[in-house]
């Protein structure tokens, strides 16, 4: 049959459907397309890639001109018509029937002759029905999985979700399915509320995507039209068991640790309070009913659902010797089900927690626990009903005898961390990376002691020897391990006590066994985003922050971890948390980059950067090359060719009495600049440039341009660093002087500057600290979505240029802005300028970290 097959057998519908199909075959017209300014009205959001070989694709709404909605008919094989081959069922999966057991009707059919169809069409012909798997109705279930049909209407930001997987790049080993990896807040999927992370997409309208390459699924979603029907499969949530436990406090209090709560979520999107550790010898361990992963619902008569972490801690502390607990225990799982994607954030082991006991501290620092760390997979927000890793199951389910485990290295390495190796205490598994080879095998457990690796005896090995054995083990690794939770618990307690001793020592005396820095307290500006929920190595409660945030580091004595609090425009936050030190950030980033090299920053102006039309004889390239990028490092000259790794910039608070200049960089900057001046002419203005070009009759000196008397004079001023940027066009010099910018700033207006990133540093040197905002596109597809006249090639060039811009000038940006629409980006920029317009600002400090 042809693609324009009619949706039913009646003559009335045939011609309508065939005509629509013929229209679809007409090629789109491109004659009216215009090549936009590369940094004109365009934007960003879309494709993204994960870590360690995982990938995802954010789905924008349709690129280019909006096409006519597709009217592809559903093909119904009968005894007379031979339709397309039905989709091949995925082995081990049930194939859902889209509309129950009755005949399928094309939803866009306007024909009223359904009775004619039912009389004229025989029942569908089934070949070898015994070989087919049982069908499932949509919005039904088979006990293990639930199937649902979801209809979404494409919004301004597309469908509002990201996907990963496919035959060519499985998101889950041995499963070619297409999985939802992210629901974008405010998008169509989020507003609808039915689609969830880890849902497996089986069908997009009439296209079977249960076993296709990733690009085919992306294409199906892009071409689905404004209304998209999805058939998805998801795991049935395991029911929780509610239990009441009475505990009698002992010398170690209640004997367990907790994490979670409002503002301190243990699992992103979940405010519940979870048990994260059972302390050896404590009341909880002796009672035996509480386990890691249990969810606390109430303490005595106090409800612990949707409360702050501090409230939960206070409720547990303010109890008598006999404590009544109400807990929810996770339900059982189908452990052998390989079609459920792993939950990359369901491990309740290494996140921040607080001990509930009489003498425990609620925070500690230190980097005693040395680890072999492997790259993490992408974070996927979980639900309470995520699969529970094997290492969270009941202790009695695991043998205490040595056992052989065979792991195959993947893109995430082996997927576990080790500790130990001092004084013959043994090598222990301290962390299982969710979704990594160790986790997916289900054989390795936190608390396992590693006895050997590929025949190499590690019973008395040092940490370095064990790490080396694991690193050189090859792709297939045979591990002999023995579950020794008591020994591991004693080791953990020793580490905890040692950390507290060192922390107390460093806090009280400023010295101790930690290698300390002379700087005990300082203010820094973050030059990267940090999400504490994605850091499995945190020794205590972490503090998340974004690029450009000001942090008050109240203790920088440790080499690996600092204590800090956020500084907002309204003052300092009360919450204190742990952040990675500058040294740790740089060490991790260098390990990630490995042999990847970037072009060294030069600080010279490029001829085609921000002055379209200027010749290659761009004047500043020869005369401003002395201005180079500074780094916050004090690295030796032998490393001069390496890019500085952005971590923190020391800052100091300064009072100013002028309106700060504004520099917008990235796609859509011209549109934003124009809108700011148009909407707020009393707040924003532009400065008068200088030129050696002769004045024309209708031009006014000092109003249209500052006309310089001689070329020699302007060349001298450029060499004397009186210009933030200059260039040559048609043998005439043009430039923006520092004095012109200062004149606007001292009148109380923000001077909007259309300059390159090099100007930021020159303004700082002139004590005119600009508000520099970088518009960072989310993806090539998002650029095309915000400017539908762009071709893919044009958007790709703009995206690449933006990435190079960030790489070259990232350390000088005040803030980085992203959004799904121009309006969203514009509103964010206005808010940033408002926040940065006070009389007190944070400026770079000459101090070294």
UniProtKB/Swiss-Prot annotation:
Compositional bias of kind Gly residues: 41-53
Region of interest (Disordered), residue spans: 32-101
PDZ domain location: 149-235, 244-330, 404-484
Start and end residues of each SH3 domain: 519-589
Keyword Nucleus: no
One GO MF term attached to the UniProt entry: ionotropic glutamate receptor binding
UniProt feature, compositional bias: Polar residues: 57-69
Positions bearing Phosphoserine: 157
Recorded superkingdom: Eukaryota
GO cellular component, one term: neuronal cell body
SMART domains the UniProt entry points to: GuKc, MAGUK_N_PEST, PDZ, SH3
Family matches, as Pfam families: Guanylate_kin (PF00625), MAGUK_N_PEST (PF10608), PDZ (PF00595), PDZ_assoc (PF10600), SH3_1 (PF00018)
One example of a Gene Ontology biological process annotation: receptor clustering
Keyword Phosphoprotein attributed: yes
Residue list for modification Phosphotyrosine: 705
PROSITE patterns in UniProt: GUANYLATE_KINASE_1, GUANYLATE_KINASE_2, PDZ, SH3
Keywords: Phosphoprotein, Repeat, SH3 domain
Binding partners and assembly: Interacts through its PDZ domains with NETO1 and APC. Interacts through its first two PDZ domains with ERBB4. Interacts through its third PDZ domain with NLGN1, and probably with NLGN2 and NLGN3. Interacts through its PDZ domains with GRIN2B and SYNGAP1. Interacts through its guanylate kinase-like domain with DLGAP1, DLGAP2, DLGAP3 and DLGAP4. Interacts with FRMPD4 (via C-terminus). Interacts with LRFN2. Interacts with LRFN1 and LRFN4. Interacts with FLTP. Interacts with DGKI (via PDZ-binding motif).
Protein family membership: Belongs to the MAGUK family.
Role, per record: Required for learning most likely through its role in synaptic plasticity following NMDA receptor signaling.
Protein name: Disks large homolog 3
């Amino acid at each position: 049959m042809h693609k324009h097959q009619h949706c039913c057998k009646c003559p009335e519908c045939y011609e309508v459907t065939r005509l629509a199909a013929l229209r679809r075959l007409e090629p789109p017209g491109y004659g009216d397309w215009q090549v936009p300014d590369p940094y004109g009205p365009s934007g960003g959001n879309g494709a993204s890639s994960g870590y360690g070989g995982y990938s995802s694709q954010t789905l924008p709404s349709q690129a280019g001109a909006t096409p006519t909605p597709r009217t592809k008919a559903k093909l119904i094989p009968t005894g007379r018509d031979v339709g397309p081959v039905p989709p091949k069922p995925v082995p081990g999966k049930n194939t859902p029937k889209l509309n129950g057991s009755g005949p399928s009707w094309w939803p866009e059919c306007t024909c009223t002759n359904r009775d004619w169809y039912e009389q004229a069409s025989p029942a569908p012909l089934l070949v070898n029905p015994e070989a087919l798997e049982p069908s499932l109705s949509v919005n039904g279930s088979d006990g293990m999985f639930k199937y649902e049909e979801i209809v979404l209407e494409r919004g301004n930001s597309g469908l509002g979700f990201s996907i990963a997987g496919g035959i060519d790049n499985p998101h889950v080993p041995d499963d070619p399915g297409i999985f939802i990896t992210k629901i974008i807040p405010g998008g169509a999927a989020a507003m609808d509320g039915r689609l969830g992370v880890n849902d497996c997409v089986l069908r997009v309208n009439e296209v079977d995507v249960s076993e296709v390459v990733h690009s085919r699924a992306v294409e199906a979603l892009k071409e689905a039209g404004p209304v998209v029907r999805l058939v998805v499969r998801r795991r049935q949530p395991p029911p929780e068991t509610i239990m009441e436990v009475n505990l009698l406090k002992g010398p170690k209090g209640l004997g367990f640790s907790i994490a979670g709560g409002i503002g301190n979520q243990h699992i992103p999107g979940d405010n519940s309070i979870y048990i994260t550790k059972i302390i050896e010898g404590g009341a909880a361990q002796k009672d035996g009913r509480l386990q890691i992963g249990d969810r606390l619902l109430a303490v005595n008569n106090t409800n612990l659902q949707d409360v702050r972490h501090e409230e939960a801690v206070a409720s547990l502390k303010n109890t008598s010797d006999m404590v009544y607990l109400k807990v929810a225990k996770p339900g059982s799982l189908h452990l052998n089900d390989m079609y459920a994607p792993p939950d990359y954030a369901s491990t309740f082991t290494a996140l921040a927690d607080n001990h509930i006991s009489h003498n425990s501290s609620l925070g500690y620092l230190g980097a005693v626990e040395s680890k072999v760390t492997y790259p993490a997979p992408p974070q996927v927000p979980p639900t309470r009903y995520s699969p529970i890793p094997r290492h969270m199951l009941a202790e009695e389910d695991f043998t205490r005898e040595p056992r052989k485990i065979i792991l195959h290295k993947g893109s995430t390495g082996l997927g576990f961390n080790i500790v130990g190796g001092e004084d013959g205490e043994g090598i222990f598994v301290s962390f299982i990376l969710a979704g990594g080879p160790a986790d997916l095998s289900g054989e390795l457990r936190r608390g396992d002691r590693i006895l050997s690796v590929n025949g190499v005896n590690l019973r008395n090995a040092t940490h370095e020897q064990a790490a080396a054995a694991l690193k050189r083990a090859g792709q297939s690794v045979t591990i002999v391990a023995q579950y020794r939770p008591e020994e591991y618990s004693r080791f953990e307690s020793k580490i905890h006590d040692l950390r507290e001793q060192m922390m107390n020592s460093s806090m009280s005396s400023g010295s101790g066994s930690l290698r300390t820095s002379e700087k005990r307290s300082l203010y820094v500006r973050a030059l990267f985003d940090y999400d504490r929920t994605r850091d499995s190595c945190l020794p205590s409660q972490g503090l998340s922050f974004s690029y450009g945030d000001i942090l008050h580091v109240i203790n920088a004595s440790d080499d690996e971890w600092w204590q800090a609090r956020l500084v907002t425009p309204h003052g300092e936050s009360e919450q204190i948390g742990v952040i990675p030190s500058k040294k740790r950030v740089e060490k991790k980033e260098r390990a990630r980059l490995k042999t990847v090299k970037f072009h060294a920053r030069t600080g010279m102006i490029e001829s085609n950067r921000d002055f379209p039309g200027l010749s290659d004889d761009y004047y500043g390239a020869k005369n401003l090359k002395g201005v180079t990028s500074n780094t916050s490092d004090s690295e030796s000259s032998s490393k001069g060719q390496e890019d500085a790794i952005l971590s923190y910039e020391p800052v100091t608070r300064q009072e100013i009495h002028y309106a700060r200049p504004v520099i917008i960089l990235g796609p859509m900057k011209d549109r934003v600049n124009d809108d700011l001046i148009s909407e707020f002419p009393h707040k924003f203005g532009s400065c008068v440039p200088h030129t050696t070009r002769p004045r024309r009759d209708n031009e006014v000196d000092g109003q249209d341009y500052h006309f310089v008397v001689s070329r020699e004079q302007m060349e001298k001023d450029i060499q004397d660093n009186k210009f933030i940027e200059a260039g040559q066009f048609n043998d005439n010099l043009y430039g923006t002087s520092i004095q012109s910018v200062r004149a606007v700033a001292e009148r109380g207006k923000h001077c909007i500057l259309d300059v390159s990133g090099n100007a930021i540093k020159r303004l700082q040197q002139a004590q005119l600290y600009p508000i520099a905002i970088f518009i960072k596109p989310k993806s090539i597809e998002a650029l095309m979505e915000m400017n539908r006249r762009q071709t893919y090639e044009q958007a790709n060039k703009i995206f690449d240029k933006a990435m190079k811009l960030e790489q070259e000038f990232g350390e000088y940006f005040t803030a980085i802005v992203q959004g799904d629409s121009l309006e969203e980006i514009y509103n964010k920029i206005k808010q940033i300028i408002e926040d940065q317009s006070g009389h007190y600002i944070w400026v770079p400090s000459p101090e070294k970290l």
